[in-house]
Design a protein with these regions (language model features):
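Flexible, low-complexity linker and terminal segments
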Residues: 2-10, 132-338, 343, 356, ...
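Short helix-loop-beta junction
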Residues: 39-45, 243-253, 468-474
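Short acidic, glycine/serine/threonine-rich loops at helix termini
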Residues: 36-39, 62, 83-87, 109-116, ...
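A glycine-rich helix N-cap at a beta->alpha junction
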Residues: 45-52, 93-104, 184-187, 426-439, ...
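Conserved thiamine diphosphate
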Residues: 106-155, 161, 196, 336, ...
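Thiamine diphosphate
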Residues: 1-135, 226-227, 285-287, 292-506, 512, 516-517
Length: 579
């Protein structure tokens, strides 16, 4: 009897990769995709790695595929932008061993800077897309994706969303298959994409998509559920669950292959229902194609292009139900905030004091944009802080940049910050870059990277030394400082921003949540010395609260003894005690 387990969608994807016989997996962590690799590494049959960025991860998977084995890359939707260069080209080349890219979209922007739809990228790249609707399908579709990849000589994208990635469901486990490795044969016409070869491969790719679209009508992953024919829905992925919840008796065409679309199947389904609704999260990808075929349907006229969908959306827009209005629960506000003891808070308290603006980047330190720290002024994408600062200096001059810095984390610096810093040096820029080194990829759950000295598979390896790396670029002014030494940090910041050349400040202190961090002190208030000035409250540490009489309390269950509040108080109204 097969074993059944309750699995997250991401966990099921990892299981599907295992059962499909995958041998190589590469990724860069990014919510909501991170747990895929964290679960894949549990299977010793699969080599798994954290790559410096998604482009590298995609290329690692491509290399493994060309050599003849089944390989995959996984990333969040904005990571697909970084990986798009190799993705677009490998679509032309095709594969040898099966090749799958898992892309996790984020409707509702729970942890992302935009709400892009990976299906749009896939259409431009001419890469087929599968979209599972629950954990069981997440596992099964992974296996099916590798079969399709090898059958049609194409990379395949498996598209997930935050809700699927982080929802649980029953999954029937099966044994791992061990496909015979494909034999590699030298074939420059297929694998060397210079213009002459690429022109011929483009013709092949167009034919491949047409063939696949024709075959899609008979694919088992596209399912027709004929019930009441007054209402019909075409949907896919997690949105299917909302349709079944709101309209259990409606007819439904659930698409498992969401690009290319099975035109004949869609036309047949549409002809059998009175009113056809297209229910798809984010962009009107289905709707635009279906309407272009002359099929009457209703989509974004009543459904939004923004945010997550829900069963209530259907009840209101389709069934015209008056939903019961309920008062929102009265709960305390929980704005995003840096953790107690976070070294970034110490850095930002200094920048705030000096009235220095920061070009920001992607990571926990993005929270430096919100009050009371209010330091970060811009955030675009991974690695953009340094390039943005450089652009400001070239536009406004050296004097303008004296009260600006770029802030970037150690993992993000490894991701795409190095090229930006190199550009700054090469093009004779001026400006101060602060690398906030907390020895981890903190925002996505403490994954290792090239500068930590440990791989995803737990191997101890030489760590990239960020200080020496910056020096090797020809930067004369590279300084390391303890993030919590605010006196020294303030002195260094003043000194470096005044220089008419590139300088780098590396603030070093491990993330407070890292395993193995041991805290031997706590901070306690001394009320009789307090003059109620509020200096200790300025960094916004959640462990500190203001009492009715103006003195402060420190929650000992939250305090990590970092000492920032103590260092800010010049009157000795906060002390540290051993614990």
């Amino acid at each position: 009897m097969s074993e059944v387990k309750i699995m997250l969608g991401n966990e099921a994807i990892a299981r599907g990769a295992f059962e499909a016989g995958v041998k190589v997996s590469a990724a860069y962590p990014g919510t909501p995709s991170t747990e895929i690799s964290e679960n894949i590494v549990k299977y010793p049959e699969i080599y798994a790695e954290w790559s410096p960025n998604e482009k590298v991860a995609m290329e690692v998977a491509i290399g493994a595929s060309i050599s003849g084995v089944r390989a995959m890359a996984s990333m969040k939707h904005v990571g697909v932008n970084v990986a798009s260069d190799p993705l677009y080209t490998i679509s032309y080349s095709g594969v040898n061993g099966g090749l799958v890219l898992v892309a996790a979209d984020d409707p509702g922007l729970y942890s992302s800077q935009n709400e892009q739809d990976t299906r749009c990228v896939a259409r431009a790249a001419m890469v087929p897309v599968l979209e599972p609707s629950d954990s069981q399908e997440a596992k099964d579709f992974m296996k099916y994706a590798f079969d399709l990849s090898e059958k049609y000589d194409t990379p395949i994208i498996v598209r997930t969303t935050t809700r699927l990635s982080h929802s649980q469901g029953p999954v029937t486990l099966e044994e791992r298959c061990e496909p015979v490795d494909a034999v590699y044969e030298r074939n420059p016409a297929k694998y060397v994409m210079m213009p002459g070869n690429a022109k011929l491969r483009h013709v092949y790719v167009e034919k491949r998509l047409k063939d696949m679209a024709a075959d899609a009508c008979d694919m088992s992953i596209n399912k027709v559920e004929m019930n009441d024919t007054k209402i019909g829905f075409i949907t896919s992925g997690i949105a299917y669950q909302y349709v079944k919840e709101a309209c259990p008796n409606a007819s439904v065409l659930k698409l498992g292959l969401v690009h290319p679309l099975p035109r004949k199947l869609i036309e047949e389904f549409a002809s059998k229902v009175e009113t056809l609704y297209i229910f798809e999260e984010l962009e009107p990808v289905f709707e635009e194609q279906i309407k272009s075929w002359g099929i009457k349907c209703i989509g974004k006229e009543i459904f939004t292009v923004q945010g997550e969908y829900s069963a209530n959306m259907i009840r209101k827009a389709v069934l015209k139900e008056d939903l019961e209005l309920k008062a929102a629960a009265q709960v305390p506000a929980r704005p995003p905030i840096l953790c107690p003891g976070c070294p970034h808070r110490s850095v930002y308290s200094v920048l705030n004091k000096l009235k220095i603006h920061a070009a920001g980047d992607i990571g926990c330190y993005t929270l430096g944009a919100v009050a009371p720290l209010s330091v970060v002024d811009t955030t675009v994408c991974m690695g953009a802080s340094i390039s943005t600062l450089h652009g400001m200096e070239k536009a406004k001059g050296k004097d303008y940049i004296k009260n600006w810095v770029a802030v970037i984390g150690d993992s993000t610096f490894m991701h795409t910050g190095i090229n930006s810093l190199m550009n700054m040096v090469y093009n004779q820029g001026t400006g101060t870059v602060m690398i906030l080194d907390n020895s981890t990829t903190g925002m996505t759950g403490h994954q290792d990277h090239a500068a930590t000295g440990k791989t995803l598979m737990g191997e101890e390896v030489p760590a990239i030394n960020i200080f020496h790396l910056c020096k090797s670029l020809g930067i004369k002014n590279v300084v390391e400082v303890n993030a919590f030494d605010i006196v020294e940090l303030e002195r260094i910041v003043k000194e470096e921003v005044a220089k008419d050349e590139v300088s780098v400040i590396i603030t070093k202190s491990p993330c407070v949540l890292l395993k193995g961090n041991k805290f031997t002190t706590k901070c306690v208030p001394v009320p009789e010395k307090c003059v109620k000035c509020g200096m200790c409250l300025k960094p916004g540490c959640p462990a500190l609260t203001k009492n009715a009489d103006g003195t402060i309390s420190i929650d000992q269950t939250m305090c990590n003894g970092c000492g920032l509040c103590k260092n800010l108080c010049k009157l000795g109204a906060i002390e540290t005690v051993e614990v």
